[in-house]
C-alpha cells in the first residue's frame, strides 16, 4: 500500500534508476544490468521446463497425449493462432482470438527459412525474456532489493500456468507489453504507457486490467493538476493517455461487432466457445461438487491454485506499490476468476498475467541461502511443467 502523501512517494517519483550504473550495490558484475540476470534466470527455467516436458511426454498418463515436444508447442489454441497468422480469419468464429499475436507471428514468418511455428516460438521466447527483464526492473524499483527482484521473476517463470511460456500462446507477449506499460506508468511516461496499452488491447481481452491501471494513475494526476491550476504542459500527457489507452481493446471489440452485426459480438463469440464471464460460478460449482462427492485430483489441484492466487492477492494489497499496480493485479485476478464456465483448468494460465503476485513469496524466500533457492526453483519449474501437462491430459486445457 502506498504511504501517505504523494501517490508515487519514495523513490518511485524518480525515474527508474539505471541499475547497471550501481552494479556493486546490487552485487552484480560491472556493466551487467540486474534485469539481464532476471532474463537469464527465465531462460534457464524455460530450458528446464522443456527438458522436463520432453522426459515426461512418453511416460505414464502423459503418453495419452500422443504428441512430441514439437507437437506440444503448437497444440491446443496454438493451432488457432497459427491458422490466423497464415490465413487470416477464415471464419467469423475465429474473431474471438485477438489479432496482435498472430500478426507478430506473420511478420516474423516473412523472414526466409522461418516457419510459422518457429516464428510463433520466437515471438514467445523474445517476449518472455522482455517480460522477465521488465519484471526484474520493476521489482528493483519497488523493493530496492536484488534478491527479491530476481526471486519475483523466477517465481513468475515457474507459476502453475507457465507451460504456455514455452508454447505458441500469447501470454508471454501480453505480459511483456503489460509490464513495460506498468513501468512507464510508474515513471510517468504517459504516452509510452498509453501506446503499449493500445498494443496490449490487440493481444488479449485482459487488457482491461491495464486500461484500469492507466485510469487509476492518470485520473489523480489530472485532478491534482486542475486543483493546482497548473500549466497545460502538466496535464495534457495524462489526459491523452487516459483517452488513448482503451482504443486498442475498444477498437477490436468494435471491429468484431461490425463483422457479426451485434454490439456484443465479441462477447457472443466468446460464449460460443464455452467461455465468457460467469462471475465465478464455475469455481463455486466445482467447490460444491468437491465437497459433496469428493474432489478429483484435477479439481483439487486447480482449486488449490485458485485459493493460493486469492490469498496472494489479499497479501499483495499490504505491499507498498503505486495504486495503478494494485489496480492491475486486482483486475487481472478478478477477470481470471470470473471467466468460465467451461475451462476451469485454464484458470492457472489466466492468472499468469498477475505477475506481481510473486512479490510476497519472494520476500518470504529472500532469507534462504542460494544453495537452497536454486534447487527449490528447479523443482518448482519441473512441478509446474508436470502440472501443465497434467491439465492437458486430464483437464482438457493448458
Write out the residue ranges for each language-model feature.
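Membrane-lumen/periplasm interface segments of specific transmembrane helices
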Residues: 45-64, 73, 211-312, 321-329
Amino acid at each position: 500500500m502506498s504511504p501517505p502523501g504523494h501517490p508515487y512517494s519514495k523513490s518511485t517519483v524518480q525515474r527508474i534508476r539505471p541499475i547497471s550504473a550501481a552494479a556493486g550495490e546490487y552485487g552484480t558484475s560491472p556493466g551487467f544490468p540486474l534485469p539481464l540476470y532476471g532474463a537469464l534466470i527465465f531462460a534457464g527455467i524455460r530450458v528446464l521446463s522443456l527438458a522436463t516436458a520432453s522426459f515426461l511426454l512418453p511416460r505414464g498418463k502423459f503418453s495419452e497425449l500422443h504428441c512430441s515436444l514439437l507437437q506440444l508447442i503448437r497444440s491446443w489454441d496454438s493451432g488457432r493462432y497459427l491458422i490466423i497468422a497464415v490465413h487470416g480469419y477464415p471464419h467469423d468464429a475465429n474473431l474471438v482470438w485477438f489479432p496482435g499475436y498472430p500478426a507478430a507471428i506473420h511478420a516474423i514468418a516473412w523472414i526466409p527459412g522461418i516457419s510459422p511455428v518457429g516464428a510463433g516460438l520466437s515471438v514467445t521466447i523474445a517476449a518472455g525474456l522482455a517480460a522477465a527483464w521488465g519484471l526484474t526492473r520493476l521489482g528493483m524499483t519497488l523493493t530496492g532489493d536484488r534478491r527479491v527482484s530476481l526471486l519475483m521473476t523466477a517465481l513468475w517463470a515457474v507459476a502453475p500456468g507457465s507451460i504456455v511460456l514455452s508454447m505458441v500462446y500469447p501470454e508471454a507477449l501480453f505480459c511483456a507489453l503489460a509490464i513495460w506499460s506498468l513501468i512507464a506508468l510508474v515513471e510517468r511516461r504517459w504516452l509510452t504507457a498509453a501506446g503499449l496499452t493500445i498494443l496490449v488491447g490487440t493481444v488479449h481481452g485482459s487488457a482491461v486490467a491495464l486500461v484500469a491501471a492507466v485510469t487509476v494513475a492518470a485520473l489523480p494526476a489530472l485532478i491534482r493538476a486542475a486543483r493546482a491550476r497548473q500549466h497545460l504542459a502538466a496535464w495534457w500527457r495524462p489526459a491523452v493517455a487516459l483517452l488513448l489507452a482503451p482504443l486498442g481493446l475498444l477498437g477490436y471489440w468494435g471491429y468484431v461487432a461490425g463483422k457479426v452485426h451485434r454490439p456484443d459480438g465479441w462477447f457472443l463469440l466468446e460464449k460460443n466457445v464455452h467461455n465468457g464471464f460467469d462471475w465465478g460460478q464455475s469455481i463455486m460449482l466445482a467447490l460444491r461438487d468437491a465437497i459433496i462427492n469428493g474432489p478429483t485430483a484435477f479439481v483439487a489441484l486447480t482449486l488449490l491454485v485458485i485459493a493460493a492466487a486469492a490469498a496472494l492477492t489479499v497479501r499483495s494489497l499490504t505491499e507498498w506499490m503505486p495504486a495503478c499496480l494494485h489496480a492491475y493485479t486486482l483486475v487481472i485476478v478478478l477477470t481470471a476468476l470470473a471467466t468460465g464456465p467451461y475451462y476451469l483448468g485454464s484458470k492457472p494460465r489466466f492468472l499468469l498475467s498477475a505477475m506481481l503476485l510473486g512479490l510476497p513469496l519472494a520476500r518470504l524466500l529472500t532469507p534462504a541461502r542460494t544453495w537452497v533457492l536454486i534447487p527449490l526453483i528447479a523443482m518448482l519449474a519441473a512441478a509446474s511443467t508436470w502440472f501443465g501437462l497434467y491439465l492437458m491430459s486430464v483437464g482438457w486445457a493448458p
